[in-house]
Amino acid sequence: MNSSIEISSYRDQHFKGSRSEQEKLLKASSTLYMGNLSFYTTEEQIYELYSRCGDIRRVIMGLDKYKKTPCGFCFVEYYAREDAENCMRYINGTRLDDRIIRCDWDAGFIEGRQYGRGKTGGQVRDEYRTDYDGGRGGYGKIIAQKINPNTLER
């Protein structure tokens, strides 16, 4: 198997089912998780780039749970596993909006997963980031709150 399309060690901790059920779904899936997107990347940009690998069934943009604004990830569902494999081969690790995008297999989108799981509504990884990243909303949420306690509002 090509290392660019292998199943990674990451597993969705909120998956409802056994580890072996999740593995089976991942190996047959045509859904990909895309991470490290800019908060400003649009659904149209996702379609434009990812459709180069095949026909897309749908794109589900990741949203802040409270603000309903993009928070740096999405799910891309292809019609065919082969197209998703091509995406893993050719698009994973490339740049979009000056960011290196991460692609990973997903067991299949379930309603509710489009929302960030962090305490503040976004992604958990953005809450603990200590650097400034303009493409992902500036400083991490915890640092931003220390700098200006009024920055975290729901």
From Swiss-Prot:
Domain RRM: 30-108
Keyword annotations of the record: mRNA processing, mRNA splicing, Nucleus, RNA-binding, RNA-mediated gene silencing
Residues the entry annotates as binding mRNA: Y10, Y33, R102, C103, D104, W105, D106, R113, Q114, Y115, G116, R117, Q123, V124
Gene Ontology cellular-component terms listed: nuclear cap binding complex; nucleus
SUPFAM superfamilies for this protein: RNA-binding domain, RBD (SSF54928)
Subcellular location: Nucleus
Source organism, top-level taxon: Eukaryota
Chief location: nucleus
GO BP terms: mRNA cis splicing, via spliceosome; regulatory ncRNA-mediated gene silencing
Record InterPro entries: NCBP2, NCBP2_RRM, Nucleotide-bd_a/b_plait_sf, RBD_domain_sf, RRM_dom
A GO molecular-function descriptor: RNA cap binding
The protein's assembly and partners: Component of the nuclear cap-binding complex (CBC), a heterodimer composed of Cbp80 and Cbp20 that interacts with m7GpppG-capped RNA.
Family from the record: Belongs to the RRM NCBP2 family.
UniProt function note: Component of the cap-binding complex (CBC), which binds co-transcriptionally to the 5' cap of pre-mRNAs and is involved in various processes such as pre-mRNA splicing and RNA-mediated gene silencing (RNAi). The CBC complex is involved in miRNA-mediated RNA interference and is required for primary microRNAs (miRNAs) processing. Also involved in innate immunity via the short interfering RNAs (siRNAs) processing machinery by restricting the viral RNA production.
PANTHER family in the cross-refs: 20 KD NUCLEAR CAP BINDING PROTEIN (PTHR18847), NUCLEAR CAP-BINDING PROTEIN SUBUNIT 2 (PTHR18847:SF0)
Record's protein name: Nuclear cap-binding protein subunit 2
